[in-house]
Amino acid sequence: GDSTFFHSGMTGAAEIVYNNGRMIPCVLDNRITGMTGHQDNPGTGYTLQGDPTALLSVEKILTALGFAPVLTVDPQDLKAMKAAVDQAVSALNAGQQPTIVTRRPCLLIKRDKFRKGMCRVDTDKCRGCRSCLKVGCPAISLENGKAVIDRTQCVGCTVCAQVCPFDAIEKEEK
């Protein structure tokens, strides 16, 4: 994540470039230090005391270290994510050193702001193919062979809707 990148990942990133590493590092930027209690980090623009400060750019640091291209994408936009991975693989095969930054606010912190609606299943369209279950979302289960979404757990990210081949899942706006 972004916090680990600032804490200890920059040195590893420098080593990848220095040693001509054949890999595509990804920084999962959720703008918080989730593993130790949701503190701010250098990518948030706030000090640990909550005062405004310089916001360090993950992308600018990666560029300064020698990565190119540096691709930024919303990880919940599956088409954009696939396009970024494809572009990064092509760049790597062309001798470049690509990297991907995925950016999406941490749901544990931004849940109320992010939750603008939940997904629901149109049972007439659902064919029980289980594509949505492969997403691994805890809100989705099967009842009578068809997908159902637990409204108390759904955060409205729409990843399930993006993978449904029958367009049986849609977002209900609040």
PLM feature segments, named:
Residues 28-31, 75, 104-105, 145, ...:
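Short, ordered loop/turn segments at secondary-structure junctions
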Residues 127-148, 159-174:
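Iron-sulfur cluster-binding cysteine motifs and their immediate structural context
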Residues 1-99, 111-112:
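Thiamine diphosphate
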Residues 3-4, 49, 123, 148-151:
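Residue-level marker of alpha-helix boundaries and capping positions
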Residues 89-142:
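Glycine/aspartate-rich loop-and-adjacent alpha/beta segment that forms the canonical ThDP
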